[in-house]
């Protein structure tokens, strides 16, 4: 009997070994500053079926995340966050398994799409529970702004909170925090008096028709244009976390302004990636074809009386104070710092500030461009409280963005 058991286990060993693959990843910080929560992304295309993963550093388990970017039930990328000292090099061991489920870790990001629950009248404004993760409206829909409870998909890290309006503006509206924590699941952008008394944040920016924080739009030769007309407009959540959330805004059949006569309609996907521990948000702009003959725009709202900063190389920011609502009796004035960082190769011109916006006119060579947005609220106990502090932070932030860690894979 014992001999048979031994032979059975021996026969199973090759299968067990085959079921997992190990990768060694070295991460080097070339900068003379300590860096926290640095995203490390591993493309899984070459590793066959991956159902679960384990990341360790010196034998200690590190939280990781598997993402199915195209929603075909296959994981495309693995993500983990590295804390690395100045000039330090660390090695991480990744074990990939072709069975099981992704390991659970505490959530450090959150994303939500929700419709109002009109049946249960007892629910408060911040207790709505008709959760969805994909919504499409026809281009001739009369009024999509109020279709979702908080007007569009929202997402957050411990440091920030953003919602994207589900209409032709597609503006990023901002939630300011006092404490470094996740809040949107509880407040849904509608913080009640009890939550405010406990130190929860709230909406801190009135955006109107402006860019808000880095909305991506067209350019008609004289001014920014909203994303219309379109055949359909969609929002969806690709990933809920726990280390990064990914949401997409998809415009199909957009008749965008172009530099040629009779341009054809284009499809555009705006992918927003929010990493834990980050106040900045990555924006990927993806098209279904080359858009060399089109012009686009982005920028930030000119907050009333704001002070401007520009390094004339793609980093543009402001610091200002205004009411976050037209109801000036209910709301107090809020001070915010905003910024957008655009690659120089995509900039056609940096336009002078007007009463609404600090604007960049953009071009896209090929089918994709990427940029970043970031902000702070002066309410933060962990943030920045003057224009000088904010602008100094942004200069250091840009250096980190342009000096990535060095990642090497060893199979």
What spans do the regions from the language model cover?
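Beta-strand-rich recognition/accessory modules
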Residues: 70-84, 338-411
